[in-house]
């Protein structure tokens, strides 16, 4: 049994806290910390105040160090903002504690995310005898594990992957994002990159559109190609992959609003002066959009996130589709959050279980696909995210 410190009390933090509390056999003590302690206290109240709460500025290494020394966890689960990954990693190094996150580092002033900043910590974590597990959400995270499963069990050589993320839910709002609006809009407006024949190919944001027929009654939906961080680590650690693409569904309504917001400058991340004050338009937009946490009781429908992997098996072309279906209303009933937060938070807890039980262990900085996928998936299903495998069959080449 081990103590865990969770940093971040948004929608994902709420899920992580609830799911850790369901596994007291692993997480004997839980502390939830955020810049706004009232958010932590509200989540604690949902759990009959059976957890500790604390205030911390995750941009401030000395504050983080003081909190970690006080709470003495064996693991820090970082579900704060991607801008804060490095300060939390620094604090873990200073205090000798293992680290886990769900999204890679991104500088505040540049809409660019990549693993180079965090991979640079490899020698420091290894030298300290510590483990850092990066991207233990769903995508990245479970999608990496699905790719590793395809390589281990279904294909002798994985040559192509399509990671496909569908939110077939509806919240009834004119325009809202299902997670932090600032992070979401920065992500979807960034130039698209995909991996092909040993190099990154850049195209316009959401410029490539296809249709995909999703299972479990969801049916055909439009999907758009975009860049997503797990491709960077997957093609590094599974070098047989010649082509890797990431696709996501967006409604026409979402795209229409996004285009207008871009055209009028509201997605800018640089400062502008207004009434003698400097503001960042995208941060102002975040303040006026619905809080993603408020969408839980409004959201109905399902998500479907998975990987279509193609390659060779016994010298013949073969493909496998590995995916999960998650229901928004069922998630809200269980933990008070919609499926977007649930599908990120549950894998973070499972990653923590892998680390604390020694099923996944190493010294240094690791991505999910570097470990055996099966122990992770054996825990993920009972924790609420079962895996479906369709081995063979016809799936369109995207």
Give the residues covered by each predicted segment.
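Helix N-cap at the beta1-alpha1 junction of Rossmann-like dinucleotide-binding domains, i.e.
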Residues: 36-38
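Rossmann-fold NAD(P)-binding glycine/threonine-rich loop
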Residues: 103-130
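C-terminal catalytic/substrate-binding lobe primarily of soluble NAD(P)-dependent oxidoreductases
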Residues: 152-398
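Conserved Rossmann-fold cofactor-binding substructure of NAD(P)-dependent oxidoreductases
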Residues: 58-71, 80, 84
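Short beta-strand element of Class I
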Residues: 29-31
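Rossmann-fold cofactor-recognition segment
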Residues: 47-60
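Hydrophobic/small residue at the entry helix of a nucleotide-binding pocket
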Residues: 12
């Amino acid at each position: 049994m081990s103590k865990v410190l969770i940093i971040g009390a948004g929608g994902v933090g709420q899920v992580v806290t609830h799911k850790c509390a369901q596994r007291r056999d692993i997480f004997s003590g839980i502390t939830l910390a955020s810049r706004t302690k009232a958010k932590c206290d509200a989540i604690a109240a949902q759990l009959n105040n059976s957890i500790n709460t604390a205030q911390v500025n995750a941009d401030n290494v000395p504050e983080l160090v003081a909190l970690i020394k006080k709470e003495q966890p064996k693991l820090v689960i970082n579900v704060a903002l991607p801008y804060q990954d490095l300060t939390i990693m620094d604090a873990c190094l200073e205090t000798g504690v293992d680290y886990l996150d769900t999204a890679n580092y991104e500088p505040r002033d540049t809409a660019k995310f990549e693993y180079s900043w965090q991979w640079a910590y490899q020698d420091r974590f290894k030298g300290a005898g510590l483990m850092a597990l990066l991207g233990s959400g769903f995508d990245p995270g479970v999608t990496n594990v699905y790719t590793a499963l395809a390589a281990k069990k279904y294909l002798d050589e994985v040559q192509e992957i399509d990671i496909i993320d569908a939110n077939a839910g509806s919240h009834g709002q004119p325009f809202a994002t299902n997670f932090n609006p600032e992070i979401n809009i920065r992500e979807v407006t960034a130039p698209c990159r995909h991996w092909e024949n040993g190099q990154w190919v850049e195209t316009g944001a959401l410029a490539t559109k296809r249709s995909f027929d999703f299972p479990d009654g969801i049916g055909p939906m439009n999907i758009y190609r975009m860049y997503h961080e797990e491709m960077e680590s997957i093609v590094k650690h599974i070098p047989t992959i010649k082509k890797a693409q990431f696709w996501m569904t967006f409604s026409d309504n979402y795209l229409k609003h996004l285009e207008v917001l871009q055209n009028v400058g509201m997605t800018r991340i640089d400062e502008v002066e207004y009434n003698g004050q400097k503001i960042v338009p995208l941060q102002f937009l975040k303040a006026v959009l619905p809080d993603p946490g408020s969408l839980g009781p409004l959201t109905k429908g399902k998500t479907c996130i998975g990987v279509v992997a193609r390659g060779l098996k016994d010298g013949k072309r073969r493909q496998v589709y590995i995916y999960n279906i998650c229901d928004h209303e069922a998630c809200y009933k269980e933990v008070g959050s919609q499926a977007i937060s649930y599908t990120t938070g549950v894998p973070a807890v499972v990653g923590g279980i892998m680390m604390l039980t020694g099923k996944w262990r190493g010294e240094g900085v690791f991505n999910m696909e570097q470990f055996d996928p099966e122990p992770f998936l054996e825990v993920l299903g009972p924790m609420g995210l079962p895996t479906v495998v369709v081995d063979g069959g016809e799936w369109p080449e995207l």
